[in-house]
């Protein structure tokens, strides 16, 4: 099967094909997320050793990470504590339930099923070393490392998350009642809400998936930023759990490990080849970007980037 050349024209075609789909809507249960332009559709690709290519149908602005930010405590704690310790705090099994499921935690706890669920990310946030400001500095350190620059927290989104985050509070208290929360509920949730409220431009999102595609090495400098072991584990978790109870469908169609967020960002990885980020805030009931998935599937087919292809 021959693959196309990766060009701006191809990315433009992918965006225009995705624009034809009018399904989904912005995630209005976090009020600030409802204010974004729901027609925004964009893609950026960094192939290893090549220049970044990007295309957007509208002017770009910073968008919050939401659940793509769950990669930060996962990778940071893997690097600092190792897999054996991390798997004492959270399992790595696909859940088959929605990202904020309380039933799943109650039935199969006390460990959350995986780090990509809200319960899993909250459990990991409670294990961030230090107290108070030390924990926020830890987050800042790992944001700097995984995005190769500092990111800002959107204060309106942070306030919105805190004001409407009752289900996440319920998850945190349930974890606490099962002795699987390593810190105070309120302090842990502040870290979790901050994590979701970091905001980044499209090109800023591209560093992390490219880092994972390159076995943890900075593609420009060759510096080893993350261990190969951490990259291997992270990609396996993305491939099995990255889009919640739609991960199987995603992997069948694209063959790319990925992580989605309700803001519309999805990052995807083609190991040894490329890092990808797509953006469209029209999300489905499972919290995944509908147009984002259309673009990833089209890109995978055009470039023969499905992991199962020889």
From Swiss-Prot:
GO molecular function: glutaminase activity
Residue positions binding substrate: 67, 118, 161, 168, 192, 244, 262
Keywords (A to Z) from UniProt: Hydrolase
Enzymatic reactions: L-glutamine + H2O = L-glutamate + NH4(+)
Highest taxon of source: Bacteria
E.C. designation(s): 3.5.1.2
Top-level enzyme category: hydrolase
Single biological process term from Gene Ontology: glutamate biosynthetic process
Pfam family, one: Glutaminase
Quaternary structure (record): Homotetramer.
NCBIfam families documented for this protein: Gln_ase
Family: Belongs to the glutaminase family.
Stored HAMAP family: Glutaminase
Name under which the protein is recorded: Glutaminase
Organism field: Legionella pneumophila (strain Lens)
């Amino acid at each position: 099967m021959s693959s196309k050349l990766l060009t701006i024209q191809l990315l433009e075609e992918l965006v225009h094909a995705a624009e034809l789909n009018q399904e989904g809507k912005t995630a209005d249960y976090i009020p600030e997320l409802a204010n974004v332009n729901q027609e925004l559709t964009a893609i950026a690709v960094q192939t290893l050793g090549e220049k970044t290519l990007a295309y957007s149908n509208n002017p770009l602005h910073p968008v919050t990470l939401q659940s793509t930010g769950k990669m930060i405590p996962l990778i940071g704690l893997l690097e600092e504590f190792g897999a054996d310790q991390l798997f004492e705090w959270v399992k790595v099994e696909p859940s088959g339930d929605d990202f904020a499921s309380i039933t799943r935690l109650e039935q199969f706890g006390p460990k959350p099923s995986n780090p990509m669920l809200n319960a899993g990310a909250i459990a990991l946030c409670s294990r961030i070393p230090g107290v108070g400001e030390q924990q926020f500095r830890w987050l800042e350190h790992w944001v700097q490392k995984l995005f190769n620059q500092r990111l800002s927290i959107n204060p309106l989104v942070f306030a919105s998350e805190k004001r409407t985050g009752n289900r996440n509070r319920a998850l945190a208290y349930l974890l606490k009642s099962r002795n699987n929360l390593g810190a105070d509920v309120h302090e842990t949730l502040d870290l979790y809400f901050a994590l979701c409220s970091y905001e980044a431009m499209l090109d800023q999102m591209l560093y992390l998936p490219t880092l994972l595609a390159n076995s943890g090495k900075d593609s420009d400098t060759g510096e080893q930023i993350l261990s190969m072991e951490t990259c291997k584990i992270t990609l396996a978790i993305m491939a099995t759990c990255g889009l919640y109870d739609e991960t199987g469908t995603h992997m069948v169609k694209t063959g790319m490990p990925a992580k989605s967020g309700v803001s519309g960002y999805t990052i995807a990885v083609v190991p040894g080849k490329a890092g990808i980020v797509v953006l469209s805030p029209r999300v489905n009931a499972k919290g995944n970007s509908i147009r984002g998935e259309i673009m990833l599937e089209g890109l995978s087919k055009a470039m023969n980037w499905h992991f199962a292809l020889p």
